[in-house]
């Protein structure tokens, strides 16, 4: 297992959940957190603890977004019309690294971030190497021609463990994806339950 995989699965162990639904997650074999004290029985969490855990889980899912970035996204979500929790999910799903992952151009969120940073992705025909780039409805995302035969791309196409959600229209022959609409929480194919309303409560304290 690579260092990147170890870091990724450490999030699973800390949460005690297989948050990406990966078959190789160590949580499939044990139900305690990382480290020598991971097997200690956990007590009941306080309301604050439950809210914090919900925030850590969602941050971890989106490739461990920094607190500064995550809070900035939350603030933007509160300024939009509608439910702040739903808005938060919509903004996270508009991140370019999320769309690349959802489109099955790569196998993990972490790989999506690296793939973009290395210049393998175009948006509307122009190279974009910023993983936090905000995709708009109607944008077309594509893998660069020279990158389409990379092993990481070919492997991701074969993954049976997840499907492309219906708010992204993908052509894997051309390696293109069109972002069709901003999803609601219920549209997003999370492997575990996400609770953005608890994150709103956390930041509203």
Curated annotation (Swiss-Prot):
| CDD domains per the UniProt record, alphabetical | S4
Gene that specifies this protein: rpsD
Relate the assembly described in the record: Part of the 30S ribosomal subunit. Contacts protein S5. The interaction surface between S4 and S5 is involved in control of translational fidelity.
NCBIfam families (alphabetical): PRK05327.1, rpsD_bact
Q: Which PANTHER family match?
A: 30S 40S RIBOSOMAL PROTEIN (PTHR11831), SMALL RIBOSOMAL SUBUNIT PROTEIN US4M (PTHR11831:SF4)
Role according to the record: One of the primary rRNA binding proteins, it binds directly to 16S rRNA where it nucleates assembly of the body of the 30S subunit. With S5 and S12 plays an important role in translational accuracy.
Recorded hits in SMART domains, A to Z, give: Ribosomal_S4 (SM01390), S4 (SM00363)
**Highest taxon of the source?**
Bacteria
* Region Disordered, annotated ranges: 18-46
Recite the UniProt keywords alphabetically.
Ribonucleoprotein, Ribosomal protein, RNA-binding, rRNA-binding
Q: What is this protein called?
A: Small ribosomal subunit protein uS4
Q: What PROSITE patterns has UniProt attached to this entry? A: RIBOSOMAL_S4, S4
For this protein, the record's HAMAP family field holds:
Ribosomal_uS4_B
Residues of the S4 RNA-binding domain: 94-157
Any Gene Ontology biological process: translation
Q: Mention any one GO cellular component term assigned to this protein in its UniProt record.
A: small ribosomal subunit
Recorded GO molecular functions are:
rRNA binding; structural constituent of ribosome
Q: Which family does it belong to?
A: Belongs to the universal ribosomal protein uS4 family.
